[in-house]
Amino acid sequence: MNKSLVAVGVIVALGVVWTGGAWYTGKKIETHLEDMVAQANAQLKLTAPESNLEVSYQNYHRGVFSSQLQLLVKPIAGKENPWIKSGQSVIFNESVDHGPFPLAQLKKLNLIPSMASIQTTLVNNEVSKPLFDMAKGETPFEINSRIGYSGDSSSDISLKPLNYEQKDEKVAFSGGEFQLNADRDGKAISLSGEAQSGRIDAVNEYNQKVQLTFNNLKTDGSSTLASFGERVGNQKLSLEKMTISVEGKELALLEGMEISGKSDLVNDGKTINSQLDYSLNSLKVQNQDLGSGKLTLKVGQIDGEAWHQFSQQYNAQTQALLAQPEIANNPELYQEKVTEAFFSALPLMLKGDPVITIAPLSWKNSQGESALNLSLFLKDPATTKEAPQTLAQEVDRSVKSLDAKLTIPVDMATEFMTQVAKLEGYQEDQAKKLAKQQVEGASAMGQMFRLTTLQDNTITTSLQYANGQITLNGQKMSLEDFVGMFAMPALNVPAVPAIPQQ
């Protein structure tokens, strides 16, 4: 048989397979749209219930090799959102290349069969216009996603450079590249990426020009949805440099910032152990080197169901605040109410007897390092039925024990206070002299009130508590006696003489 005829037959056969496969995949996507939108709304309700937003779709057009549709994000009917007004929506254009070999993936030489390849861009409308203005009329971002037949997805997110300038306000952003992966149910998610630089110019409440810049922002993390409805996993965020300037003069320079958080499930997935690590390699204020710091905070034995209840109550209360314009439009009042909501829900977290550990919170300069180490064992007050009769009984309802130790090398403290004095305008010699006096005075006062000790040129405080008893720097006393050390003595105010009778 003629080889040319064979080749033509193969090409025709492949075309039939391709067309049939692409059409089937297009129909499959259509049948999954409702489920995908429902899952998106369920995820949105879980992660940001206070947003009062929902996702929907419109203008679906299915073709043989590709389809188009629009996704809308808008306020839930009858509810308010501070960013999107009723009747408004954020709209995304979705261009879908059908599988099993989407054209967009073939352009990247990706030959792995997949259900679809999707390109997402933002529609320019009343809500999104400010972003388009900052991007000089271009789409501010582009997302290219690959959806496998399993339903898992992988997305490349490209944030475009932004520039905005009006009077004394300016925003400049280099753009960034991020990768988002998710399983079909949205339970397992990972995000990584970086942005090179950013700059914000504004005017503060004192009518001063303020500028904030950052360089080399990186993030990398993953999380899964636990059985009790909350996310656990790992997250890392780092920033090479950030500067804050006022009226053209550099006020602060922060270098080498890194935050790492992780949470693990134990006890058959019912309990969470979490850890937060924060480090700052260098802090300079007005060119004065104040040193470096780090913090390791661990919270263990968190009951998963209790955490979920806390999250639900806190989110419900903060969501209710956003529905009250007199609160939502007043930042100070809103923050006050949010804090109240947090502490009102906090007792729920004590179920499971959590343990809080700080080891360490430290600050270091050229002359030494100060450190605070603390362990706090808590317990569920609901397990105690009797009403407390004393202060110790009240504390013991929630606290099993406390162990804390603070160490401050005198030389380190003196160096730190010297830098502070120089910031206040003192010359080097004067600053050292003043700092020495301040540290010696604080140390002497601490010893006088039995709050600190001085040994090996280090100011130290140690405090332990358990069962109503305090041990302060080795001296035992009751909780009431300890509190009495800080009580103000009663002032003998003479009685006001009676007004003489006329």
From Swiss-Prot:
Q: Does the keyword Cell inner membrane apply?
A: yes
List cellular component terms (GO). plasma membrane
Name of the protein described by the UniProt record: Protein YdgA
Family, similarity comment: To E.coli YihF and H.influenzae HI_1236.
Task: Tell me the compartments it is located in.
Answer: Cell inner membrane
Q: Tell me the name of the encoding gene.
A: ydgA
Question: Topology versus the membrane, per the UniProt entry?
Answer: Peripheral membrane protein
Per its UniProt record, what Pfam families does this chain match?
DUF945
